[in-house]
Amino acid sequence: MATMAAIGSLKVPSSSSNHTRRLSSSSQRKTLSFSSSSLTGEKLNPTQEIIISNLPRGNERRTPSIVSPKAVSDSQNSQTCLDPDASRSVLGIILGGGAGTRLYPLTKKRAKPAVPLGANYRLIDIPVSNCLNSNISKIYVLTQFNSASLNRHLSRAYASNMGGYKNEGFVEVLAAQQSPENPNWFQGTADAVRQYLWLFEEHNVLEFLVLAGDHLYRMDYEKFIQAHRETDADITVAALPMDEKRATAFGLMKIDDEGRIIEFAEKPKGEQLKAMKVDTTILGLDDERAKEMPFIASMGIYVVSKNVMLDLLRDQFPGANDFGSEVIPGATDLGLRVQAYLYDGYWEDIGTIEAFYNANLGITKKPVPDFSFYDRSAPIYTQPRYLPPSKMLDADVTDSVIGEGCVIKNCKIHHSVIGLRSCISEGAIIEDTLLMGADYYETDADRTLLAAKGSIPIGIGRDSHIKRAIIDKNARIGDNVKIINTDNVQEAARETDGYFIKSGIVTVIKDALIPSGTVI
């Protein structure tokens, strides 16, 4: 096994579909679940249920229900009552993503979900840990680009995951493949799932939980799934309020007073963006925050009923490649019940160098970090490495996170994240920097041989100064190197010299060598 907000009143219908539906036998009320760092909906009296099969949509009588907000935290009100429970009835599908061009050069030698995070972890650990903490033990990870390190990490971190119902849990990697029926690689998120539907449909589950492998957040998926079932949804989309600056990068939606999605636009711009503005006070935001965040954005996380997924990808939209731009809007147009699940906790789409940098440095924030790895109720798991404790000799370290197995000598480190096995020499200054560390230690014999060749050992050399930078794994930074971007260059590609600059952040490539005395 691996080591280790909303206030509002929404009406929620009890509906049916062309598939088997659960209908209340009385007019008592149900609730739409909220997920928030501070507030959740109060659950009202449950009702006895009966099963009605093949009832045509539109012929049923819908009984609206009211959310009654209650000021309690998720940790205080974490009870769910899934029947059957998630370990038996839900299959997790994590999408490994595309080539990760916006994260280049961090994705030069690895898949996007394999990019190191928070000193000890990798991005893929976030959705996998969320699944395991939510009692979802059957998990597939779909990969395509540079997947060797991702496959290695998953096999080492989660190979012994045999939890769940009858100890049938697993975390398995599914690589893109060609076949006589489909000679193409994955063309998008929906196409990736479609190509493995033959495998997914063999599992006796009720829902597919579709997740992205490059998001940073903590979510109880059991509440998400419970909301899907209680609202009798065909598809449920996790959503959150969004400001105008970032809205163009996401799918945006409009919802009615029942929480049902009535309009969906993928990454709109110009007039189309303006048309997607809504009054987000319906999500429970106060007037001031609603003005700052006038959009409802999709998180790219979906719960889809199994029979609905099979029908949509095979019959309704056999040529659709993407969930956000094709399948979700298409399902809405078909009249399927597509619900929004409102989430107001911390969430970051780590799709760019700047977003990745800010997310990592955010864990050093005082007094409360943007994202905490210290939540014992929902830990983040990763590969057990059995490294020794980090050793700091006369070092001055402030507002920083230090990973396992580091050797830090007589240097200054401020507001930085230092990855595992990092070696930092005397006199170095590290500020506002993400240092990813190393995959291995070099022996004294290795260092002697490198010195004889005039080369540089892995780590940060003497008297070097690094500020606002990302130093990828196994980088060799010589003595008296200055990576401080004194000219405030915003964009530069110097791959032959071992680095890129994006959004003013210097990124040193994995395995790069920066000679002594270099100034960047």
From Swiss-Prot:
GO terms for biological process: glycogen biosynthetic process; starch biosynthetic process. NCBIfam families: glgC, PRK02862.1. Signal peptide: none annotated. GO terms for molecular function: ATP binding; glucose-1-phosphate adenylyltransferase activity. Heterotetramer. It comes from Brassica napus (Rape). InterPro entries: ADP-Glc_PPase (IPR011831), ADP_Glu_pyroP_CS (IPR005836), NTP_transferase_dom (IPR005835), Nucleotide-diphossugar_trans (IPR029044), Trimer_LpxA-like_sf (IPR011004). Its EC number is 2.7.7.27. This is Glucose-1-phosphate adenylyltransferase small subunit, chloroplastic. Pathway: Glycan biosynthesis; starch biosynthesis.
